Regions:
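Major-groove DNA-recognition helix of helix-turn-helix-type DNA-binding domains
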Residues: 15-45
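Intrinsic disorder/low-complexity segments enriched in polar/small residues
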Residues: 4-6, 25, 59-61
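A short, Lys/Arg-enriched interface patch at domain edges and termini
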Residues: 46-65
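A generic structural micro-environment signature
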Residues: 7, 13, 38-41, 49, ...
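Polyanion-binding surface elements
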Residues: 1-22, 54
Length: 65
């Protein structure tokens, strides 16, 4: 069985609990890395993890300030 390597923007939105439009904005702005695959965007699981970790670090820095 082939292991899934990519997520769609809609799948990432659901994983993060964000709306689709917010997630598309994050992807198009580069906040969440992606590649263009035809008409679609594809996102590696590690890119989602990197985004979450970056947001957590930013929040921790705000709390400690």
């Amino acid at each position: 069985m082939i292991e899934r390597k990519w997520f769609t923007t809609a799948e990432v939105a659901e994983m993060l609990g964000y709306g689709l439009s917010k997630t598309k904005t994050l992807v198009l702005s580069g906040e969440i890395h992606s590649i263009k695959d035809g008409r679609n965007r594809r996102i590696l699981p590690r890119w989602v993890d990197e985004y979450v970790e970056r947001r957590a670090r930013e929040a921790e820095m705000e709390w400690s300030a």
